[in-house]
A protein has these predicted regions:
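Positively charged, low-complexity terminal tracts
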Residues: 1-111
């Protein structure tokens, strides 16, 4: 049976907050000047504000949660492709980012 209500409250630790904050800020910088990404700009700026707050529990909307999950999954796929093509040193750098993103996805967005 499908759940009727989904909980969009998240408790990120300090490191996860920092990673997500930089991730959202980078996304904002990339799409900042394009009018066709108005909805995404609104979502990611809201996410940055919520991650900057000192609250323990962060309440996301359904759109924010879905967009963040989608972007993290896309980033994981991109990093896996880049790692397959890169040399040892780059793989080493990408591996830490990849594991951090995968941990966030598995801990907070799966199930």
């Amino acid at each position: 049976m499908k759940k009727l209500f989904t909980n969009y409250n998240f408790e990120f630790n300090k490191n996860e907050k920092k990673i997500l904050k930089t991730f959202c800020s980078q996304n904002l910088k990339q799409i900042q000047n394009e009018n066709k990404y108005f909805a995404e700009i609104k979502i990611f700026s809201s996410l940055v504000e919520k991650l900057n707050s000192s609250e323990e529990v962060i309440k996301l909307t359904k759109d924010e949660r879905n967009r963040l999950k989608l972007q993290l999954q896309e980033n994981v796929n991109y990093l896996k492709k880049k790692m397959a093509k890169s040399w040892f040193l780059k793989k080493l750098l990408y591996k830490s980012m990849l594991t951090q993103y995968e941990n966030i996805l598995s801990n907070h967005f799966e199930g």
